[in-house]
C-alpha cells in the first residue's frame, strides 16, 4: 500500500518546498524505499506551457510530453523516479475534468460543488499519480492562507483520515526571519502559519524551518510547544551554497528516520555516499571555465533551471568549476561581441519571440568564426542554421518564419506534421491553439556515423525530449549541406533535422540540437552532450592560457 508525505509551505512563497521534497525523496530512496513525487499547482491554467517565464520560470518537459512545473525537474534530478503527466496537475485540470464529467451526466443531476466533487477529483488524481510507489511525496503549491490552495488542503486533510495516521505524514515548510535590531530569529510567523493550517484541520507532524543561521535550542523548544510538534521534529533548513547539500543536511537531523517512524516503515540505513562524492567534486575543482550564456531571460535564471543544473553536473563530472556569464542578447545587439572575447565557450538556449534574436545570431557568428566551442539548444540550433545560411551559404535574408513570415529563405519553418512517441501522426497549422500543441516529449533520434554527435553519445540512436513548433526546413537543407553544414541527427520516421554540427576541420566543437538535453541530465550521471561541451571549453581554456 502506498503511503503519503504531504509537503505544504507557509509565511511566504519560494521557500524551497520542491528542493525539500526532492531531498527527502533522495534520502528515502537511498534507504531502499521506492518513491515518487507529485506537485499540485493551484493556478487555473491547465498547464504552465503558455505562461511567461517571468511569471512561472522554467517549463519542465517529461518523457511522455507533459509541460510541467520546474519542481518536477528537481524530483528527477534527486531521485531515479521518472515523472509523467500524472505527477503534476493544476486547478485548471481538475475543474476541466469535473466539468467534462458533469457534461457527460456522471453526477446524475447532482449540484456539482467544490466539496465533495472537486476534492474527490483531487484525491483521485493524487492516488493515480502515486500508484506503484512505496511512498508518494506530494507537494502542495502556494502558501497556506491563499484562497487558491484551499481545495487542495481540504483534499489532503481528508486523505489523512481516509488513509490512516500510519499512512500519512504532514510536513510544513516555514520561515524564521532574523531581525537585526532584535538580534534574534522570530518564531511568530511560523506559529501563525501552523495555526492557519490547524484551523483547516491539518496538524503538521514535522516542521522544516528555513533560516539563515542555526536555530537555538530554546527557540526550537518554543516552536515545538506552540506548534504542537515534538522538539526533534523541528528541523532547521539552513541556506546552502549548493542544493545538493540539502539531503545530507536533512539526514543529519534524522528527517528520514522521523518520516519512516511516522509511516511505520522499516528500512535499511541511508547511504548518501553518492551525494557526498558529488559535493567533494563540486568543492574541489581542478580547473575553471567561463561560459557565455546568451539569452533573453537572463535576469530571471529560474527560466533556465535545468540547463544551469546540467552545466553544473558537467562541471562535477569534469572536475571543473563552470562559471556561467549571463549575457543579454539585446545588449549584444547594441554593443557588439567584445564581451565574448574572454569566454571559453558560448551557449544559446531555447526561447520564443523575435526580441534579441539578432544578438544571439551575432554571438553564434562569433563562435563559428573564432572557433569557440558552441552549443545551441532548440532555438539556439535554429539560429545557428540561420547564421550559417546567411553568412556561409549566401542566403543573406534567411530567417525563421516564426520571426519573418515573408523571408525569401525560410530555413526554419513551422512543423505541420510529425510522429509522436507511439507513432501517431500529429498535425498543426498556424491557427492551432498555443497550449499543448508543440512537439513534446521523448523522441528517437538517429545519429550519423562519423559525426561528433555519434562520438559524444557513443550510440547510433538516442532518445531526447522536445518542446518546439519550428524545425529546420528540409527543402532548403540540401543546399546548406552542400556548403558544409553537417546534419548529424535525424528523426527516423519524419526525417526531421534534430542535430547539426560543423566538420572537425572547420571548427573544433560546434553542435546544435533541436531537443532539450538538459531535461535528462542529473548530478549522478551528468549528460554526455554537456560533459563533452565542458571538456571542449576546458581544452580551449588550456590552449589559450598555454
UniProtKB/Swiss-Prot annotation:
Sorted UniProt keywords: ATP-binding, Glutamine amidotransferase, Ligase, Magnesium, Metal-binding, Nucleotide-binding, Pyrimidine biosynthesis
GO CC annotations on file: cytosol
Enzyme Commission (EC) number: 6.3.4.2
Amino acids binding Mg(2+): 71, 139
Name of one Pfam family that matches: CTP_synth_N
Subunit and interaction comment: Homotetramer.
Further comment found in the protein's record: CTPSs have evolved a hybrid strategy for distinguishing between UTP and CTP. The overlapping regions of the product feedback inhibitory and substrate sites recognize a common feature in both compounds, the triphosphate moiety. To differentiate isosteric substrate and product pyrimidine rings, an additional pocket far from the expected kinase/ligase catalytic site, specifically recognizes the cytosine and ribose portions of the product inhibitor.
Descriptive protein name: CTP synthase
Source organism (scientific name): Azoarcus sp. (strain BH72)
